[in-house]
Amino acid sequence: MPSRWPGVAGPPALARTEGGEGSAGHSYPQNSKGTGEQHKADRIKEGHRVYAHIAKLQELWKTTQIQTIHIPKSMTDASFLKHPELTLGQKRYLCSVAKICNSSYLRTLMKRQYMHIFHHGSQKTGVLTHHRGHMSSRYSQKQHSPCTAWRHHLEREDSLSIAAGAPEMIIHSLWRPLRHKEGLKIGYASKTRCKSLKIFRRPGRLFLLPVPSNDSQSCPSEETQEEDLLNKCMQSMSIQEQGPAHASLTV
């Protein structure tokens, strides 16, 4: 069958159809692939936009909201709020400044804050509200507590019993050399010195501490015991002098 279009090997419709189909079939996957990538990119951008919006909302939710300033009715007729060009926000700002500058309002705020701290502290253990009362009660208990008085009484009884049961330790603790004008002599401390010493007991130790004159006068029994111990010690000891600069002690 002779062709109607010379120079064409095959039917042009078929070739065009095949070429069209081939070109269409070749270009269709490219268009679908590009469209899919574009949709994917759009979805990613939309997701980023949504996540950014959610993060912004969360940040705004976490931040503290500024309290709205309400203009009281008593200040609506104030001269500084009657300016026609003032906006509502400017009027609220001026109202807040006027409240801050007002001394009575400051006193009210201070009183409210004080009452809040007072009630908040009273709910605890009473450290803020009754601090002075606790301190005074502790001081009075320390001064007049029966346990403290009983402990002092036991310490005094222990000191007296130790003084009566161990005279040798007391004698040796009271004995010390004295220097006179004539030369070196061996003897005991003066009577006033012995009176000003008081015996205290600690676990495993016995030592002397100076006591004021009032305390020594208020305890005549201890003084008499010390004097008796000194007399006994002096009776049991004799001093022999050998020359002006030598002395020996015999018991």
Swiss-Prot record:
Transmembrane segments: none annotated. Residues 1-41 are annotated as: Disordered. It holds the Pfam family FAM216B. It comes from the Eukaryota. InterPro entries: FAM216. PANTHER family: FAMILY WITH SEQUENCE SIMILARITY 216 MEMBER A (PTHR16476), PROTEIN FAM216A (PTHR16476:SF1). Belongs to the FAM216 family. This is Protein FAM216A. It comes from Mus musculus (Mouse). The gene is Fam216a.
